[in-house]
Amino acid sequence: MPRYYEDKPEGGACAGVKEDLGACLLQSACVLQEGKSPRQCLKEGNCRALQYSFFECKRSMLDARSRFRGRKGY
């Protein structure tokens, strides 16, 4: 679930998604119960939707077409 705070400063284009991904990984059962690192849990498939959203956000910053025309699929 996305978390947005009004008193937090802007950190960049994908800072919110990155923070949500980190929080999701740290709160997952993989990290809390099994004691694995967040990187290992990410490779196993935890928080896959947020990982894909973060990837799409980073890719849209590099893609000149989506920068000028907007994201595809709208």
UniProtKB/Swiss-Prot annotation:
- One of its Pfam families is Pet191_N
**What is any one GO biological process for this UniProt entry?**
thymus development
Residues forming the motif Cx9C motif are 47-57
- Domain named CHCH: residues: 27-65
Q: Which organism is it from?
A: Mus musculus
What Gene Ontology cellular component terms go with this record?
mitochondrion
UniProt keyword Transcription, yes or no? no
Q: Which UniProt keywords apply?
A: Disulfide bond, Phosphoprotein
Q: Which residues carry this modification: Phosphoserine?
A: S37
Q: Which gene encodes it?
A: Coa5
The short motif Cx10C motif is annotated over 30-41
Q: Provide the disulphide bond pattern.
A: C30-C57, C41-C47
Protein name per its UniProtKB record:
Cytochrome c oxidase assembly factor 5
Family from the record: Belongs to the PET191 family.
Give the protein's biological function. Answer: Involved in an early step of the mitochondrial complex IV assembly process.
